[in-house]
């Protein structure tokens, strides 16, 4: 059985390479299986009732879970509809707040903010998995590397795969209704 993370990475890469929109997993799979042609795609604007020429602005709240102030400000903006969507860093200590908010707001456009770096001076985090299971992703303090250069130099692809899958699995196990996946940094 193919995992959610691997499937998303393959589909997103394929669609990005072919410059195709990705907003519907069933449609994506049909296209990959050659049962749907590019001409059958409607833009997100068209699916929302706008014309194909209309431009839409999506305002996205990044880094939910980082700290209480980020969560409360983002929650307020989501409630007021000044922010359209958000994504949560699953490797922080404040994800319970996001899970509770998600439970109270089931129509929330909430994604997992896949995280494998820890660039903040004040906020440091490691992975969801135990340190011994992802040593290539961590520095000598068991935090993710602070920059992408070290991350790409030392990372073991199997450990990376397992950590990303664990982040998605944790969000689902906490009852978050995940609509998308994006990445930190």
Cite the ranges covered by each PLM segment:
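Aromatic/hydrophobic pocket-lining residues that form the small-molecule binding cavity
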Residues: 70-71, 95, 160, 164
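Acidic (Asp/Glu)-rich catalytic clusters
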Residues: 48-49, 74-80, 95-109, 127-139, ...
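Active-site beta-loop-alpha junctions enriched in small/polar residues
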Residues: 64, 91, 113-119, 184
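Substrate-binding cleft of extracellular glycoside hydrolase catalytic domains
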Residues: 107-164
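Structural preference for beta-strand elements that scaffold enzyme active sites
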Residues: 56-58, 83-87, 107-113, 178-182
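N-terminal pre-catalytic segment of deacetylase/amide-hydrolase enzymes
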Residues: 3-58, 69
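Catalytic domains of cell-wall/extracellular-matrix polysaccharide-remodeling enzymes
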Residues: 156-185
């Amino acid at each position: 059985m193919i995992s959610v993370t691997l499937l998303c990475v393959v589909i997103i890469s394929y669609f990005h390479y072919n410059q195709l929109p990705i907003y519907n997993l069933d449609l994506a799979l049909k296209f990959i299986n050659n049962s749907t042609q590019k001409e059958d795609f409607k833009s997100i604007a068209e699916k929302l009732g706008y014309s194909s020429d209309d431009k839409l602005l999506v305002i996205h709240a990044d880094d939910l879970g980082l700290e209480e102030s980020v969560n409360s400000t983002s929650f307020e903006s989501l409630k007021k509809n000044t922010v359209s969507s958000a994504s949560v860093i699953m490797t922080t200590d404040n994800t319970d707040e996001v899970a509770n908010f998600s439970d109270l707001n089931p129509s929330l456009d909430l994604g997992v903010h896949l995280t494998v770096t820890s660039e903040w001076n004040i906020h440091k985090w490691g992975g969801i998995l135990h340190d011994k299971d992802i040593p290539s992703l961590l520095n000598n303090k068991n935090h993710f590397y602070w920059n992408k250069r070290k991350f790409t130099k030392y990372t073991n692809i199997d450990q990376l795969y397992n950590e990303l899958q664990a982040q998605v699995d944790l969000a689902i196990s906490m009852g978050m209704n995940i609509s998308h996946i994006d990445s930190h940094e």
